[in-house]
Each structure stands twice: as C-alpha cells, then as structure tokens.
Amino acid sequence: MSNSSPETVSQPSQEVKYGEREIAEGQLITFPNPRVGRRYDINITLPEFTCKCPFSGYPDFATIYITYVPDERVVELKALKLYINSYRDRYISHEESANQILDDFVAACDPLEATVKADFTPRGNVHTVVEVKHRK
C-alpha cells in the first residue's frame, strides 16, 4: 500500500487552443502560379474530412479529392487543410459540403477547371460519393 496521495486530474482549460484558433481564423490563401500559361493538373487528397449530419447530428467522415488546373493563382496547402478542418463541427449534408468546398475554392483561386470529389465513409450500409465540377 502506498502512502502517496492520489493524483488530481486537472480540468480542461476553457481557453481556445492554438489549433482551434487557426482553424477558426483560417481562410483559403493563394499565391501566384509559377507557370502561368502552362496547363497542368494539381491533385490534392484530404483524407480526414469530417462534418455532422444535419438530420441526425452523427459525424460523417470523408476523403476529399480536389483536382484543378490553375490559372493565375495556386492554393496554399496549409490554408486548405485548416479550411477543410473548419467543417468538423458544421451540420451540413454530403451534397452541400462538396458544392460549398468547390464554390469557396473557385472563389479563392479562380482556376481554369476544378473538380471536388467527396467520398464519404459508408454509414448505415450507404456509401455516398459526390463529385462537382467547375470550368471557365
């Protein structure tokens, strides 16, 4: 038997964590395309997308695939990651999330072409894949 007193468990701090602050402040940031005039594809995979079902409140998980042909601007990847993380506590349907991501992406970098594919993890024996496209 030990004479030491039991450890106290500290309560979580109510202050906003730096990661939460970065996500809340996050915006899609772009920089100049280093090869304007050359047509090339950029493929991005974001395997940890989460949001909440607007009907049940249950979490939904997806892999987001973004493919785009840049024009004059390219999206900065850390900013994109933080933007995607901002959906974590948002109540939004599969269809609306894919469309909103595409709308915001196009507004930020005005690509020649862009496709957002949201491949949701099956829930209740239903597998949903939403693919939306933009072309100038």
From Swiss-Prot:
Catalytic reactions on record: 7-aminomethyl-7-carbaguanine + 2 NADP(+) = 7-cyano-7-deazaguanine + 2 NADPH + 3 H(+)
Main location: cytoplasm
EC number annotated for this UniProt entry: 1.7.1.13
Presence of keyword Cell division: no
An MF annotation (GO) of this entry: preQ1 synthase activity
Cysteines joined through disulfide linkages: none
HAMAP family assigned: QueF_type1
Subcellular localization(s) per the UniProt record: Cytoplasm
Family the entry assigns: Belongs to the GTP cyclohydrolase I family. QueF type 1 subfamily.
InterPro entries named among the record's database cross-references: GTP-CH-I_C/QueF, NADPH_dep_7-cyano-7-deazaG_red, QueF, QueF_type1
One GO biological process term: tRNA modification
GO CC field: cytoplasm
Function: Catalyzes the NADPH-dependent reduction of 7-cyano-7-deazaguanine (preQ0) to 7-aminomethyl-7-deazaguanine (preQ1).
Catalytic residue list: 53, 60
UniProt binding sites for substrate: 75-77, 94-95
Any one Pfam family match given in the protein's UniProt record, by short name: QueF
Keywords: Cytoplasm, NADP, Oxidoreductase, Queuosine biosynthesis
Pathways per UniProt: tRNA modification; tRNA-queuosine biosynthesis
Protein name from the UniProt record: NADPH-dependent 7-cyano-7-deazaguanine reductase
